[in-house]
Amino acid sequence: MKIENYIRDIQGFPKEGILFKDITPLLNNVEARQECLSILVNSLKGQKIDKVVGAESRGFFFGMLLAQELKAGFIPVRKPKKLPFDIISASYELEYGTDSLEMHIDAIKKGDRVLIHDDVLATGGTAKAVCELVEKLGGEIVQCNFLMELTFLNGRKKIKEYPVFAALTY
């Protein structure tokens, strides 16, 4: 089964000039979703994972599935003011300006082996911010793991010190 057949291209979304990669057909197909999960899990080659960190919001879909499959905890990384407990935050650059991500301060313990997951590696800004959060709390990043990588945006350069895996590349 080719999981790329379940990624739909949407021209001009969310704005003109963007070709959006829509993962909802993949999420909606049990066999394609399971195949994708297997590819992501197999990329870890049996490494022990204590926590899976999923970036808001599309990183939550496979992040939770990965955590379940790996028998690991799941940690959501959210946009500002979405988490109810004490947090740490990291900022990252957008095309125009900056944004930040937050994680609960008790989410990771020193020495936890962490898998970071998001749906897309684009510019690498989000992934870099998530890595900073994990390391601030003493976690060891085992891999940054993505459903897709948009290689023309060179996002790997921002997270070059970590192992990176993408199930699909465009």
From Swiss-Prot:
Involved pathway(s): Purine metabolism; AMP biosynthesis via salvage pathway; AMP from adenine: step 1/1
Pfam families: Pribosyltran
Catalysed transformations (reactions): AMP + diphosphate = 5-phospho-alpha-D-ribose 1-diphosphate + adenine
Top-level division of the source organism's lineage: Bacteria
Any GO MF annotation of the entry: adenine phosphoribosyltransferase activity
SUPFAM superfamilies according to UniProt: PRTase-like
Keywords attached to this entry: Cytoplasm, Glycosyltransferase, Purine salvage, Transferase
Subcellular location as annotated: Cytoplasm
Assigned GO CC terms: cytoplasm
One Gene Ontology biological process: adenine salvage
Signal peptide: none
PANTHER family with a match to the protein in the record: ADENINE PHOSPHORIBOSYLTRANSFERASE
Function of the molecule: Catalyzes a salvage reaction resulting in the formation of AMP, that is energically less costly than de novo synthesis.
Protein name per its UniProtKB record: Adenine phosphoribosyltransferase
Source organism per UniProt: Flavobacterium johnsoniae (strain ATCC 17061 / DSM 2064 / JCM 8514 / BCRC 14874 / CCUG 350202 / NBRC 14942 / NCIMB 11054 / UW101)
